[in-house]
Amino acid sequence: MKSDLRYFFLFCIQVEILAGEFNDSAASEMFIFHNGGVQILCKYPDTVRQFKMQLLKGDNVLCDLTKTKENEDTVSIRNLNVCKFQLSNNSVSFFLYNLDSSYASYYICKLSIFDPPPFQVDILSREYLNIYESELCCQLKFWLPIGCAAFVTVCVFGCVLMYWLTKKKYPTSVHDPNSEYMFMAAVNTAKKPAPTDVTRNLELPGTQA
């Protein structure tokens, strides 16, 4: 259920790309839609062999990837911010998912070149990613919590009502001490036999010999 709602919100979110101040000719290549998210492409010259590529959102570093060559056969790649990335011979792609309106900002690809010397820092591209949500999604985000709360309230009220009706239909048999009617103990009405240890002899007058 939660995943369905998440995909629905991702479907509602629309992304508009506006060209930045740098590399206007490559404005359409920096942002690419990818599996409900955005792929941000940062290109660098083919001659660069060791470098650090940073993806900045405004002044904040979102992704930081460093490629160094320890020897002829070993290449070390460090991804400090644990961003999903894809590295090629002349570009680094970073992937952002679960976007909302808070992600709207300028995104900057910042390249620090270690090899070939000299060391230098370049801003490769800077573009604005404008994310806005449709009116339907805004209304849905407002009414969905209210609807869920109302649904829970109705369910609780229904359960209480069902319990009350069931208790009223099948009352318990517990004796009420304040009741007008009292339970009476069973009384044995059978006659007890006469005592056999007492015997009286009655003699009629004139019957003696």
UniProtKB/Swiss-Prot annotation:
GO biological process, one term: T follicular helper cell differentiation
Subcellular locations according to the entry: Cell membrane
UniProt keyword terms in alphabetical order: Cell membrane, Disulfide bond, Glycoprotein, Immunoglobulin domain, Membrane, Signal, Transmembrane, Transmembrane helix
Disulfide-bonded cysteines: 42-109, 63-83
InterPro entries assigned: ICOS, Ig-like_fold, Ig_V-set
A single Gene Ontology CC term: plasma membrane
GO MF annotation: an example: signaling receptor activity
Transmembrane segments: 142-162
Subunit details: Homodimer; disulfide-linked. Interacts with ICOSLG. Interacts with PIK3R1. Interacts with TBK1; this interaction is critical for the maturation of T follicular regulatory cells.
Functional summary from the UniProt entry: Stimulatory receptor expressed in activated or antigen-experienced T-cells that plays an important role in the immune response. Upon binding to its ligand ICOSL expressed on antigen presenting cells (APCs), delivers costimulatory signals that enhances all basic T-cell responses to a foreign antigen, namely proliferation, secretion of lymphokines including IL10, up-regulation of molecules that mediate cell-cell interaction, and effective help for antibody secretion by B-cells.
Protein name as catalogued: Inducible T-cell costimulator
Gene: ICOS
